[in-house]
Design a protein with these regions (language model features):
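Glycine-rich, proline-tolerant flexible connector loops at the mouths of alpha/beta enzymes
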Residues: 35-48, 59-85, 115-123, 188-197
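Active-site mouth loops of central-metabolism enzymes
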Residues: 27-52, 71-73, 90-98, 154-170, ...
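N-terminal active-site wall of soluble small-molecule enzyme domains
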Residues: 54-60, 69-109
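Hydrophobic or amphipathic alpha-helical targeting/insertion segments
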Residues: 101-142
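Alpha-helix-loop-beta-strand connector modules within alpha/beta enzyme cores
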Residues: 75-96, 129-141, 204-215, 299-303
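N-terminal amphipathic alpha-helix/helix-capping segment at the start of soluble metabolic enzymes
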Residues: 1-35, 39-42, 301
Length: 383
């Protein structure tokens, strides 16, 4: 059956200074984005805070994040974002609302893209000023349309039941794209986000059937961890399997790390991401001899940041490990009050306590593979 959705063209972001150049759309891999959760207002004058932030950015990058967005509500935040961009290779996006001059300030540095909602940025001349600055800098723009900030006329139609919210989202995006076309600017990515899964799907399907502009897919205000993961999985899997979505961002009331991990797992299960560490772990039951939950919570991020195509099994008892975890490259399992380390189903080491086993696995496998000391040295030397 012929695909009714258009193949998106490629938009490039980054490439200036230390910033990586990344393609969005076309035949480029689907990228994962997230948004920084904290204010950055004082980063530009605090090297200690900057170093800590760069450390987090490095960790996000290792987990699979390709693009990072920051809220820029004031001039100090703009100055901070410019400084951050000097010290990281990850393309950074400035999230701008209301004051177009903040976008202009960010574009004085190596900020890779600007996210604006043209509906709240002001008059057309202000939009044009941002576009001209992006042209000069070689930066891209994401047109970000959310269900909570529709134009008044479309919002009224939705309230009156004369238009669906999904239709209003796509119509808003179409209007804004026409403005950018008139300004002869095509380095544009579009997002249409609702907190409803079906509205998000419908809006993106409508737009993708009409335009070859790359789509940034996300469910806005998706909620706490479990709710947000479910919503994002349903929306993303449907759209991605239809060929819609060139970059994704998961919105959770949780950490950026959890958002990135959720995104990478969705892409993996949709067949759009290969390689990397896979963690398999049992749900735990009355036979448990090992704190599965505690181990996974403590070491998940370090394991997933490894650039290795391996499976790690974390099992609570000998029923699940090594038997059910025999496909794993390395695994740990409880055995009553004792513990074992196994590889491809074969037991390699016995330990008198699960604490000893966990420490051996960390010291002899995880710690050596992460090279965390080297990472810290690299980060410290950058500022």
């Amino acid at each position: 059956m012929e695909n009714k959705f258009l193949t998106p063209k490629t938009v490039f972001i980054g490439g200036s200074g230390k910033t990586k150049r990344i393609g969005i759309g076309g035949h480029e891999p689907i990228t994962i984005q997230t948004m920084w959760k904290e204010e950055i207002v004082n980063i530009y004058e605090d090297d200690v805070a900057l170093n800590d932030l760069l450390n987090r950015i490095d960790n996000l990058q290792k987990l699979g994040c390709s693009i990072l967005r920051f809220a820029v509500p004031d001039v100090k935040s703009a100055l901070s974002l410019v400084k951050i961009a000097e010290h990281t290779s990850m393309p950074l996006v400035a999230d701008i609302h209301f004051d177009y001059k903040l976008a202009l300030e960010c574009l004085k540095g190596n900020v890779a893209a600007i996210r604006i909602n043209p509906g709240n940025i002001g008059s057309r001349d202000k939009v044009e000023a941002v576009v001209n600055a992006c042209k000069e800098k070689g930066a891209a723009i994401r047109i970000g349309v959310n269900s909570g900030s529709l134009p008044k006329d479309l919002a009224q139609l939705v309230e009156q039941g004369k238009m669906t919210r999904a239709k209003a989202l796509s119509e808003t995006a179409i209007r804004e794209v026409s403005v950018f076309n008139e300004l002869n600017f095509d380095q544009v990515v579009v997002s249409m986000k609702a907190s409803s899964v079906q509205e998000t799907i419908d809006a993106n399907e409508t737009f993708a059937s009409m335009y070859d502009i790359p789509l940034h897919v996300g469910v806005t205000e998706a909620g706490p961890l479990i709710t947000g993961v479910v919503k994002s999985t349903l929306a993303f899997s449907k759209l991605i399997n239809e060929g819609i979505g060139s970059t994704i961002s998961v919105s959770l009331s949780s950490t950026p790390e959890n958002e990135v991990i959720t995104g990478r797992e969705i892409l993996h299960e949709c067949g759009k991401r290969t390689g990397g560490v896979t963690i398999v772990s049992c749900p735990r039951c009355g036979r448990v001899g090992f704190d599965v939950h505690g181990f996974v919570d403590r070491w998940q991020n370090e394991l997933l940041s490894l650039d290795k195509n391996i499976t790690v099994a974390v099992m609570g008892c000998v029923v699940n490990g090594p038997g059910e975890g025999k496909h794993a490259d390395i695994g740990i399992a409880g055995a009553g009050s004792k513990a074992i380390i196994f590889k491809k189903g074969e037991i390699e080491h016995h330990f008198e306590t699960t604490t000893e086993a966990a420490q051996w696995l960390i010291d002899n496998k995880i710690t050596k593979m992460t090279n965390r000391t080297i990472v810290r040295q690299e980060i410290t030397s950058r500022i």
